[in-house]
């Protein structure tokens, strides 16, 4: 990049698009004003300075609005409607102001220089190193964040730390955002993504291309093209990704076809083939582990019936788009269960899985060194509604900790047929699999079930405090035994 300090940590700042009526006054965002100005300065004026002039402008501030003197600053810099202005607070009511055109190039640049740097042919985006493309998915809309290619991030210094940026649509409307990098090497744009998609009418399945405008003092990712999901020609990125994933899974696909045509002679697979389909399917409801843990527990009977414990330390998950994820298969002694690690979170995000969803896998091939499990969206969603009734969210209050009492919903008790468990000791499992006995009582005044003696100790064990919510999963296969709840996650409210 031309400016190596472009992505360095920024001073407190805010940005404003110039709307009709901007010449007489401009507002400082309330949040910024409250945090950096209110109560900290007695002065009634601010000082503005721009890169295009050595002069300093004094502007009156009334509340959080700049008034007298602002018009002179506007006229001196020839600011116009739809231009974009960044205010960087340097302290003591002093601001460095960067005036940008509607395209976010510095307005002080010569028109000829701008024309020489703007790409006009959409075909150039694929080879332009200042561009990157991404697809709109259910999961990235839900998280209000979208990934940034690693090579792009590394090229422009986004692969280290956090960097404040601006997301901008094709019409020049801006949203404040930031680029965040993680130790794993993953880089995302966090914030503003959902709003940009809504404003630009981008839907799930669409692809879009962003161009980095690195002539501005604050990095700008501007939307420069949209590829609708309809039509095969409009999805070159999707095709390329499927082809890349298919290369990894093609050998597994060939093995599946061979098994279907010839049958598998091995004893282990003849045993698994006797099942009617349920034996070859793995269904798990893991709302607590989708985002809070990377591990994914696997039922022991499934793992044993399909022979996955013999010599296999890896499994491969494949979705309906032929993309694969390789996970490490391990055994947890404390819970006496198998689990997988290494790609579960990525798998959930890519396939739009949310807390409370059920996940159904079908064993496609177990005769290879690395077993292959096929994920079905349709089957997973059909099972999701039923299994969500097994999850219970409880909010802990100071009184519930003090009295060691926490009420359960009547609907949850009724749906799961727990009425006869009142007055008995049930078991709560913490995140390490340790058992905590807790009394389940019936409060006759409110005709409701309540967790009693032992609750306080369990809350201390899982580290939940007052005003936090805890998600529990009912682990109860038959009504002849006492109910058991497994701790999933805690939610700060």
UniProtKB/Swiss-Prot annotation:
One CC-aspect GO term: nucleus
Biased composition range(s): Basic and acidic residues: 247-267
Entries under InterPro entries matching the protein: B3_DNA-bd, DNA-bd_pseudobarrel_sf, REM_fam
Main localization, broad class: nucleus
Superkingdom of origin: Eukaryota
Keywords attached to this entry: DNA-binding, Nucleus, Repeat, Transcription, Transcription regulation
Regions recorded as binding DNA: 11-103, 131-226, 281-378, 391-490
Region Disordered, annotated ranges: 238-281
Secretion signal span: none
Pfam families: B3
Recorded GO MF terms: DNA binding
SMART domains, per database record: B3 (SM01019)
Stretches with biased composition (Polar residues): 272-281
Subcellular location: Nucleus
UniProt-listed PANTHER family: B3 DOMAIN-CONTAINING PROTEIN REM-LIKE 3-RELATED
Protein name: B3 domain-containing protein REM6
């Amino acid at each position: 990049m031309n400016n190596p300090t472009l992505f360095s940590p920024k001073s407190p700042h805010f940005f404003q698009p110039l709307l009709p009526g901007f010449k007489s006054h401009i507002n400082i965002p309330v949040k910024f004003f409250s945090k950096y100005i209110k109560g900290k300065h007695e002065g009634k004026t601010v000082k503005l300075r721009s890169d295009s002039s050595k002069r300093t402008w004094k502007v009156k501030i009334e509340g959080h609005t700049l008034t007298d003197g602002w018009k002179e600053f506007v006229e001196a810099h020839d600011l116009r409607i739809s231009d974009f202005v960044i205010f960087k607070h340097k302290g003591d009511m002093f601001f460095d102001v960067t005036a940008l055109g509607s395209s976010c190039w510095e307005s002080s640049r010569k028109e000829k220089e701008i024309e020489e740097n703007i790409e006009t042919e959409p075909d150039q985006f694929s080879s332009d190193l200042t561009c990157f493309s991404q697809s709109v998915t259910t999961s990235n809309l839900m998280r209000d964040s979208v990934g940034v290619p690693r090579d792009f991030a590394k090229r422009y210094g986004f692969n280290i730390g956090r960097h404040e940026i601006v997301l901008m649509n094709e019409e020049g409307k801006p949203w404040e955002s930031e680029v965040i990098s993680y130790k794993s090497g993953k880089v995302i744009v966090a914030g503003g993504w959902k709003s940009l998609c809504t404003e630009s009418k981008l839907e799930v399945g669409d692809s879009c291309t962003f161009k980095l405008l690195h002539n501005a003092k604050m990095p700008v990712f501007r939307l420069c093209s949209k590829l609708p999901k309809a039509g095969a020609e409009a999805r070159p990125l999707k095709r390329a990704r499927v082809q890349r994933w298919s290369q990894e899974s093609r050998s597994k696909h060939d093995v599946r076809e061979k098994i279907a045509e010839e049958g598998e002679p091995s004893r282990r697979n003849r045993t698994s083939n006797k099942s009617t389909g349920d034996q070859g399917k793995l269904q798990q409801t893991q709302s607590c582990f989708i985002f809070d843990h990377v591990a994914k527990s696997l039922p022991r009977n499934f793992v044993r019936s399909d022979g996955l414990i013999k010599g296999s330390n890896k499994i491969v998950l494949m979705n309906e788009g032929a993309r694969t994820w390789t996970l490490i298969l391990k055994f947890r002694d404390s819970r006496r269960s198998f689990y997988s690690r290494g790609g579960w979170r990525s798998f959930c995000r890519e396939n739009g899985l949310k807390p409370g969803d059920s996940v159904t896998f079908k064993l496609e091939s177990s005769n290879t060194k690395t077993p292959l499990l096929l994920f079905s969206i349709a089957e997973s969603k059909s099972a999701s509604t039923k299994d969500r009734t097994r999850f219970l969210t409880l909010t802990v209050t100071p009184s519930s900790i003090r009295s060691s009492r926490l009420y359960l919903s009547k609907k949850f008790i009724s749906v799961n047929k727990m009425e006869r468990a009142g007055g008995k000791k049930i078991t709560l499992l913490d995140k390490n699999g340790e058992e905590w006995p807790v009394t389940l009582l019936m409060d006759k005044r409110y005709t409701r079930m309540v967790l009693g003696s032992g609750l306080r100790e369990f809350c201390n064990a899982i580290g939940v405090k007052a005003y936090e919510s805890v998600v529990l999963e009912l682990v109860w296969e038959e009504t002849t035994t006492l109910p058991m709840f497994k701790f999933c996650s805690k939610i700060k409210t």
